[in-house]
């Protein structure tokens, strides 16, 4: 039997409640999730837990908000997913794709991908559910 399909959820601490809502819906598709405050215990090696989860992840969901763009860990997690060549699902909240595309310092690797808004998440969840089912049947 293969490992469970794992979705790593990257977000800024300010966006924790929104990230938790996304996590609940992702779990509803049958995927497992990694959300730092839910899966890293007090006193645990934070960076080691993140690295381990990113090594196992099948895809990355990154919640992009104006304040998330200022968080170094967001960019580190995106870079790790990019290096592993796993899907990077950019979820926009509080900014538009146009604002992100024109913002200085945003890497082309994000600009080249389709992005969705939080209002488009049901479409993503439906696609994710299909990927999870395909993964289980392998």
Language-model features, listed with the residues they occupy:
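Short low-complexity, flexible loop/linker segments enriched in glycine and/or proline
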Residues: 48-52, 77-78, 103-107
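Conserved TIR/SEFIR loop-to-helix hotspot centered on a Trp-containing motif
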Residues: 66-86, 98-102
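Short amphipathic alpha-helical segments
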Residues: 5-7, 111-114
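Conserved N-terminal substructure of TIR/SEFIR domains
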Residues: 1-63, 82-86, 92-97, 123-138
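Alpha-helix boundary/capping residues
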Residues: 104, 113, 131-135
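Short acidic-hydrophobic, aromatic-tinged amphipathic segments that line or gate anion-handling sites
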Residues: 115-120
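Glycine-rich, charge-decorated loop segments at or immediately adjacent to ligand/cofactor-binding or catalytic sites
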Residues: 96-111
């Amino acid at each position: 039997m293969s490992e469970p399909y794992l979705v790593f959820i990257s977000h800024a601490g300010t966006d924790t409640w929104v990230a938790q809502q996304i996590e609940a819906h992702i779990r509803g598709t049958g995927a497992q999730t990694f959300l730092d405050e839910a899966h890293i215990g007090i006193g645990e090696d934070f960076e080691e837990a993140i690295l381990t989860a990113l090594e196992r992840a099948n895809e990355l969901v990154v919640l992009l908000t104006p304040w998330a763009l200022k968080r170094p860990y967001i960019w580190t997690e995106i870079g790790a997913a990019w290096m592993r060549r796993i899907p990077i699902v950019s979820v926009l909240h509080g900014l538009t794709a146009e604002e992100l595309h024109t913002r200085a310092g945003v890497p082309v690797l994000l600009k080249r991908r389709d992005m969705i808004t939080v209002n488009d998440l049901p479409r993503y969840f439906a696609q994710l559910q299909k990927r999870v089912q395909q993964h289980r049947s392998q």
